[in-house]
């Protein structure tokens, strides 16, 4: 799919509509007169302008789009054409119709680029494609695969889902788990990237019987995190980092407010970094259960156990590389969501077949016998060989004269 700027997007969409109009409704096409002259050329060179003139050219294209949309909106057969629907969609997403104060006529105003939605039309040849500032225009694919630490099982893809590029990864985790459960392939532990690890996703996954291991989104906590306070089993603070006990605790609608003695807080050596807010009469700290869960997860991220478990997540990047290099997934020769979904599914299936064959062949291959009877002696010989190799490289390129 070509990457079109706003001017080329207008030109391609209008030209596609006029081409179909000429093919199926020749008389209506002929009635447009001089409007179609610029769009008859297959090249977009006639619409190439300097950056300083692009705003003016966009207004002209917006006026042409508005004229065509209004001209044929009552024509039933033309209004049913996909190319006309794309033109209407483009105009709605890119333009605004306002009333002119002078003569009360309609005036087309081009929307600012920042106001254009990421799910807007990117190319009339592929209306299902979306836009992502990080990934660009087109589609994205969610992938979930198995992994085995001891290599006793092959790593196989258990879930894929093709989406428009504008879709957020945060909304993909729970549907992926539910899809895997419907196939009886649901994992007990799932490693995911940061965007998948929202608190809502973690809690919903627990209800589905899946433990999600993912870094916490958002800003890092300050010098004194909430986890520095002591909590009981009900997520209530029992002491501050300096072991001062709260005077009283109030809970209302899931929000907990802890009140500390202001006299003690005034002489605390850590008051500059403390989370407690200083008020006239008291010092208070307000939090909810979500904040407690997040701070505990941030504390767990620093543990060796978390790092050892999470390091396997990077393996899925190798899978994405395999899908690209071995199957050409990033360069499909089809357009439209149904066709892209079918192609992606077949390529993922093909990669699974290749992995199963490689796994079976590895099991059939006889294991090499361990020839090292004396590891200490072998290490000594390896060191001697390395020194000899260095000396050979050093003297090998020199000329010597003998008497």
What are these regions (language model features)?
Residues 1-403:
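Anion-binding and metal-coordination hotspots
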């Amino acid at each position: 799919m070509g990457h079109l700027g706003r001017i080329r997007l207008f030109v391609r969409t209008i030209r596609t509509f006029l081409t179909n109009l000429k093919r199926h409704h020749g008389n209506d096409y002929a009635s447009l007169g001089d409007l179609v002259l610029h769009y008859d050329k297959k090249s977009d060179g006639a619409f190439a302008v300097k950056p300083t003139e692009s705003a003016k050219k966009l207004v002209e294209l917006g006026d042409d789009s508005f004229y065509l949309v209004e001209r044929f909106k009552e024509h039933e057969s033309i209004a049913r054409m996909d190319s006309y629907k794309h033109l209407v969609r483009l105009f709605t997403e890119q333009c605004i119709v306002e009333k002119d104060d002078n003569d009360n006529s309609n005036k087309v105003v081009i929307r600012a680029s920042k106001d254009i939605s990421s799910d807007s039309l990117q190319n009339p040849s592929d209306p299902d494609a979306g836009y992502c500032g990080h990934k660009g225009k087109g589609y994205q694919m969610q992938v979930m695969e198995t992994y085995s630490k001891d290599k006793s099982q092959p790593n196989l893809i258990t879930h894929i889902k093709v989406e428009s590029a504008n879709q957020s990864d945060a909304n993909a985790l729970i549907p992926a788990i539910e899809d895997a459960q419907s196939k009886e392939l649901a994992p007990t532990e799932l490693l995911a990237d940061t965007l998948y690890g929202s608190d809502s996703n973690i809690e919903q996954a627990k209800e589905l019987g899946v433990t999600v291991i993912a870094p916490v989104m958002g800003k890092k906590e300050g010098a004194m995190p909430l986890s520095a306070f002591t909590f009981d089993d009900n997520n209530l603070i029992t002491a501050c980092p300096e072991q001062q006990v709260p005077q009283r605790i109030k809970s209302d609608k899931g929000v907990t407010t802890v009140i500390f003695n202001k006299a003690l807080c005034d002489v605390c050596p850590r008051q500059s970094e403390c989370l407690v807010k200083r008020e006239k009469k008291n010092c208070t700290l307000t939090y909810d259960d979500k904040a407690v869960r997040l701070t505990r997860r941030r504390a767990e991220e620093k543990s060796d156990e978390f790092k050892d478990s999470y390091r396997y997540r990077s393996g899925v990047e190798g899978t994405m590389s395999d899908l690209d290099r071995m199957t050409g997934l990033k360069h499909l020769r089809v357009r439209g969501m149904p066709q892209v979904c079918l192609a992606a599914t077949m390529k993922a299936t093909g990669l699974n077949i290749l992995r199963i064959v490689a796994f079976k062949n590895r099991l059939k291959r006889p294991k090499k016998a361990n020839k090292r009877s004396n590891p200490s002696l072998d290490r000594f010989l390896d060191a001697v060989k390395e020194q000899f190799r260095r000396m050979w490289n050093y003297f090998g390129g020199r000329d010597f004269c003998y008497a």
